[in-house]
Regions:
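Glycine-biased, low-complexity coil/linker segments
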Residues: 8-9
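Cationic, low-complexity basic patches in intrinsically disordered or flexible, solvent-exposed regions
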Residues: 5
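Acidic, Ala/Val/Gly-enriched low-complexity intrinsically disordered segments
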Residues: 1-2, 13, 19, 27
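Conserved, single-site charged/polar hotspot
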Residues: 20-343
Length: 343
């Protein structure tokens, strides 16, 4: 979630004046501990490639293998970023821009540290997925502040993000020796969701956990109404004359999201309805109104993994970043990246 703005994607869109969210694709090419980032044309969805370092662990000369991999520092490694110009930046400089785009810097320091570890883990884990490309679409990858957006942040804000990265330098989350998929989102509405319920894949460390203290989140509750005609067009259904038949049976997940719901006699998954109707989350209720339906949602995002507002609530009550991460990613272990088994 961009600082003080409701959507990660719209953070860049509003800052740069584009109507749709600006999408940065992070092309990853290993080239002597660096990677090349190239800007694509605006005709290609106004997308910009951003390179993400894939750090190399040096094993030494033949016959002199070290007992353990060296510690990994984001400050010592670098990426090459091509926006309008070519630039060299340390991995932590790249992650600073991610952190500023993902979480309000007014959040507690321990929450910022937790987000820093999650973002670092996400970056190095996904460097080779999707042909080495990631993007800042909030439904897909991480936000990234370009030079103009970065300059809009006061020095104190940039320093708070940099401090969170320094104080967690090189730390990543692992599960059974492998880097995890460190997914995160804005707020859950009180409980996170299980990865199986959202993406159909059972991931032990992405299970449903309580996330108290999110009531103060400005995006925790939302309400949106749709006319009958709009719903019929969006879902390709016919609601009929009997309003009481518009909404049928529903099932719910452990995390409180809609697993499936009948509308107009057809059954839809909660994930599909969220996407088709642009809802903030799958945790919603439906009320029949005169001429249409009202959807009341809790939470913002896919609700799997780290809740950013939940992390801030935990930090405000004294939890350190290690405790926050172990709560939202149960069973995971913090390691320096050089110590993790799978890169």
């Amino acid at each position: 979630v961009a600082s003080q703005l409701p959507r990660r994607g719209s953070f860049l869109a509003l800052s740069l004046g584009f109507a749709p969210p600006l999408c940065y694709h992070k092309a990853i090419h290993l080239r002597k501990e660096k990677c090349t980032v190239e800007k694509l044309s605006q005709q290609m969805m106004q997308s910009v490639c951003v390179g993400v370092l894939a750090p190399l662990v040096v094993v030494g000369a033949v016959g002199k293998l070290p007992q353990r991999p060296p510690a990994f520092s984001g400050q010592d490694s670098s990426v090459t970023v091509h926006l309008t110009d070519r630039d060299d930046m340390a991995l932590d400089a790249y992650l600073q821009r991610v952190l500023l785009g993902e979480m309000p810097v007014s959040f507690e320091p321990e929450a910022l540290k937790a987000q820093a570890v999650a973002a670092r883990t996400y970056t190095v884990k996904h460097r080779e997925k999707h042909n080495g490309k990631l993007c800042t679409d909030s439904t897909c990858c991480q936000a990234f502040c370009d030079e103009g957006v970065l300059a809009a942040f006061p020095g104190e804000a940039r320093e708070r993000a940099a401090a969170a990265l320094r104080e967690t330098d090189g730390l990543v989350l692992t599960y059974e020796g492998a880097l995890i998929d460190a997914t995160f989102f804005s707020c859950s509405g009180g409980r996170t969701e299980d990865a199986l319920a959202v993406w159909g894949t059972d991931v032990p460390y992405l299970c449903s956990v309580a996330s108290p203290g999110e009531e103060a989140a400005q995006y925790d509750r939302d309400s949106v109404s749709f006319s009958r005609e709009a719903l019929e067009a969006a879902l390709d259904i016919s609601l009929g004359a009997d309003r009481e038949s518009w909404v049928g049976a529903a099932t719910f997940t452990e995390g409180g999201g809609v697993e499936a719901m009948e509308l107009g006699g057809q059954r839809f998954t909660g994930v599909y309805l969220r996407k088709a109707l642009g809802l903030r989350s799958t945790a919603f209720t439906v009320t029949v109104e005169e001429g249409g339906l009202r959807f009341d949602t809790r939470g913002y995002g896919h609700r799997v993994g780290l809740s950013q507002y939940g992390a801030n609530a935990m930090a405000s009550h004294g939890a350190d970043f290690q405790t926050i991460l172990s709560h939202y990613y149960p069973g995971t272990i913090l390691l320096n990246y050089g110590e993790s088994v799978e890169k």
